[in-house]
Amino acid sequence: MNHTNKTAQYNTLIEQIKSLVADEHNKVGILANVSEEMKQTFPNEYFWVGFYFVQDDELQLGPFQGTVACMRIAKGRGVCGTAWNENRTLVVPDVERFAGHIACSSLSRSEIVVPIRETGSGRVLGVIDIDSTSLDTFDEKDAEKLEEIAKILAETVGESKNNL
């Protein structure tokens, strides 16, 4: 997919997400709808899309769209735990080359994980996790736009989202 088309799709997605979260307070409903909207926007790129949130010093599974997922991930383990531990977005072109990758699905070939940071402190509240069945699916444009989405979600569901 070319960058111009990808950017346009993300811009439309971001506007849809803003509309979905406006005046809503049901955290589970918001996140379920956002994950579905994300997957529908990129049906050929996103095999699995969902959220993990920091609770009891581990990442715990939140709403998602896709196959059965790992329920808990330790800090520093796999792509999600590493993104949380390092408080940075990770783009993994080939998950089999990522040391310590947790294979929740054998179909996953590439992955991007984006921290959802508390507004102000920057503390990681959770992560957006997206997997693809193709190698090298994600790039810096995905990272940039998904970080915008993470910011919207942090402002919308706030710190209390740890208590889904």
Map each language-model feature to its residues.
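Juxtadomain coupling helices with adjacent low-complexity linkers
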Residues: 2, 18, 132-164
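Intrinsically disordered, low-complexity terminal regulatory regions
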Residues: 1-63, 68, 156-164
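A short, aliphatic-rich beta-strand micro-motif
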Residues: 110-119
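Short glycine-/small-residue motifs
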Residues: 124-127
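Regulatory sensory and allosteric helical modules in signal-transduction proteins
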Residues: 54-106
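Residue-level recognition of short loop/turn positions
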Residues: 86, 120-121
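Short coil/turn motifs at secondary-structure junctions
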Residues: 56, 119, 133-135
